[in-house]
A protein has these predicted regions:
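Formylglycine-dependent sulfatase
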Residues: 1-438, 442, 451-517
Length: 517
């Protein structure tokens, strides 16, 4: 492997709360995460890093470098629904393949469950993992779930797919699955359902597969890009019996599993050390979105307002840290704004292609064959000059907050957050059911003087303070308008999915139209 092409190891948890990592909370939660902390201590920790407000959105934003408003990938809805990652939207993996990278994805995907949406037809050489969030995959074990005898058509149409192991192939298979569609250029093995029992150890399974993949690439002297998506700590948490109590007295099974989660991160870090490739490997730890706090104590913790699926910082603000020995100064704490979109241009720059954003705007060939034409608008910025100390500021000065229905909830511009729509529900699962309230005039927050967005609730002078700064709402409107201008040339790819019954009915009607076989 040449120094110009570093390995890239991206490790994600699921719904990880900032305060559940001891590098942020300083042990306040009663346990430690020494392996995750090690990445922060040996690299750069971010305080102002943003994902999206839910799982699919955060994952699609990262892997495509595009806004969910652009890709339509804010959620994928029910199993079997024909919504997922489109072939026209290149992934980090597809852009790295022509540069000589081996690409592997392990763990949760959640970007569509049809064959055409699997990672191995979107630039990854190998995939081993699940396709949904955990609570959806344990539903078939519920006592009230319809049996095959009671509702055979419904069960067959809505049953989640199993844990998939797939490999990219050069040959285009002529096999067509009646539910999941054409197989395409991949070989697919269904390793069985992700049961509640298997959930206890599935992260160990996928971590082992990632270890094997990395070893093979190292032996072949090929640079690798690995996206390791651990399923923990998504609701519901199923803790190994032998792990119970390891977080300490008066703790919880959730914290016990956080210790296991940290241990899997350590397995990958230890491997990088054992292979002697630490100096040649970019390592990132992060997550998709803010915590699902309403399931506490089986849920994560954040100091920011509210939680996942809202407009507040608690939904979007995420833990993030990056290590690259010799390039990124260890022990750095960054207060600069970064967002998941930014890693695509950053990784490509690190791999030797700093002009990828401009290339993709005008048309660029990439993909596994190196000959697939892509023309897209990347919403990310190249962070590499900032990470390596060449410049003092992140190129990103703000971001736009979207709901999972594609609504513009607000914007951040430097210190300022301007809120157009707000979730007024204070907590519980109701935050997923109650609609956002559209404000007649936007609210304003200063995320430096009020980082936890408390002022409109607690301050006697909030409204006086805000009325003196109403001019900033026009600033916010101008930023959104500028963003929307890009859609003249690059229109939205598809509409977001829905958690309502509409998509399920559509799929059931399609299924019945084929005879329900």
């Amino acid at each position: 492997m040449t120094a110009a092409k570093p390995n890239i190891l991206v490790i994600w948890g699921d719904d990880i709360g900032i305060w559940n990592l001891s590098c942020y909370s300083r042990g306040m939660m009663g346990y430690q995460t020494p392996n995750i902390d090690r990445i922060a201590n040996e690299g750069m920790l971010f305080t102002d890093s943003y994902g999206e407000q839910s799982c699919t959105a955060g994952r699609s934003s990262f892997i495509t470098g595009q806004s969910v408003y652009r890709t339509g990938m804010s959620k994928v809805g029910m199993p079997g629904v024909d919504i997922g990652l489109q072939k026209e939207d290149p992934t980090i993996a597809e852009l790295l393949k022509p540069l000589g990278y081996a690409t592997g994805q392990f763990g949760k995907n959640h970007l569509g469950d049809l064959n055409k949406y699997l990672p191995t037809v979107h630039g990854f050489d190998e995939f081993f993992g699940n396709l949904y969030h955990l609570n959806a995959e344990e539903e078939p074990e519920h006592e009230d779930y319809p049996t095959a005898e009671e509702a055979p058509i419904l069960r067959k149409a809505l049953l989640p797919r199993g844990v998939i192991h797939s490999w990219a192939t050069e040959e285009d298979s002529d096999e067509v699955d009646e539910r999941y569609g054409p197989v395409g250029k991949q070989r697919i093995e269904d390793t069985g359902p992700l049961t509640k029992l298997r959930m206890e150890t599935v992260d160990d399974e996928t971590t082992s597969a990632a270890v094997d993949f990395i070893k093979r690439q190292h032996e072949a002297d090929v640079p690798f890009f690995v996206w390791m998506n651990l399923t923990h700590m998504h609701f519901r948490t199923h803790t190994k019996p032998e792990s119970r109590g390891q977080a300490g007295r008066w703790q919880s099974p959730y914290h016990d599993t956080m210790v296991d989660h940290d241990r899997n991160v350590g397995t990958l870090l230890d491997l990088v050390d054992e292979l002697g490739i630490a100096d040649d490997t970019i390592v990132i730890y992060s997550t998709d979105n803010g915590p699902h706090a309403n399931s506490w104590p089986d849920g994560a913790t954040t100091p920011f307002r509210s939680e996942k699926a809202t407009n507040w910082e608690g939904a979007f603000r995420i833990p993030e840290m990056v290590r690259w020995p010799g390039k990124i100064k260890p022990g750095t704490v960054s207060n600069e704004i970064v967002q998941h979109h930014d890693w695509l241009p950053t990784f490509l720059a690190a791999a030797g292609d700093p002009d990828i954003v401009d290339k993709l705007k005008s048309g660029h060939k990439a993909g596994a064959d190196g000959d697939t034409e892509y023309k897209v608008h990347i919403d990310g910025y190249n962070l590499l000059p900032y990470l390596t100390g060449e410049v003092d500021k992140s190129p990103r000065r703000g971001m736009i907050y979207f709901s999972d229905d594609g609504d513009v909830l607000g914007i951040r511009a430097d210190n300022w957050k301007i809120v157009f729509m707000e979730q007024r529900c204070q907590g519980t699962l109701q935050v997923w059911f109650e609609p956002f309230t559209k404000l007649r005039a936007p609210k304003l927050f200063n995320l430096r003087t009020d980082p936890f967005e408390r002022a409109d609730v607690t301050s006697n002078t909030y409204w006086d303070w805000m009325i003196d700064r109403l001019f900033l709402m026009f600033y916010g409107s101008a930023i959104v308008t500028q963003f929307l201008e890009t859609f003249k040339e690059f229109p939205p790819r598809q509409e977001p999915a829905s958690f309502t019954i509409s998509h399920a009915v559509e799929e059931l009607e399609k299924f019945l139209a084929t005879g329900g076989g």
